[in-house]
């Protein structure tokens, strides 16, 4: 399993604009190898909002299949370029090395 994050710096007070774009079912949910998505808002930033989109995939090839798909191009087509509230962004790939799950509570 891999996790891919896209961390975006957003003009202060506008993080919700990016978050709202992910608050509905999209096309990524239908992609082979897609395991889930979380949208994270960093707490206590002063000069800008920081939003991280974290996606989980069976393999890097599954993520690459998403980025090459017509669905990805459609989801990321910004008329007039990148929205002006996005100051910067960074993509990071992680290999998942250990996963721990909660134990059932004793009865």
Curated annotation (Swiss-Prot):
Pfam family, one: ABM
Positions of Fe cation binding: 6
Any GO BP annotation: heme catabolic process
Residues noted as binding heme in the record, renumbered to the chain: 76
Annotated GO CC locations: cytoplasm
InterPro entries in UniProt: ABM_dom, Dimeric_a/b-barrel, Heme-degrading_MO, IsdG
UniProt site (Transition state stabilizer): 66
Class of the enzyme per the UniProt entry, highest EC level: oxidoreductase
Keywords attached to this entry: Cytoplasm, Heme, Iron, Metal-binding, Monooxygenase, Oxidoreductase
Localization per Swiss-Prot or TrEMBL: Cytoplasm
Taxonomy, superkingdom: Bacteria
Catalyzed reactions per annotation: heme b + 3 reduced [NADPH--hemoprotein reductase] + 3 O2 = biliverdin IXalpha + CO + Fe(2+) + 3 oxidized [NADPH--hemoprotein reductase] + 3 H2O + H(+)
The UniProt record lists the keyword Isomerase: no
UniProt cross-references to HAMAP family, sorted A to Z: Heme_degrading_monooxygenase (MF_01272)
Family according to the record: Belongs to the antibiotic biosynthesis monooxygenase family. Heme-degrading monooxygenase IsdG subfamily.
Protein name listed in UniProt: Heme-degrading monooxygenase
Organism: Bacillus thuringiensis subsp. konkukian (strain 97-27)
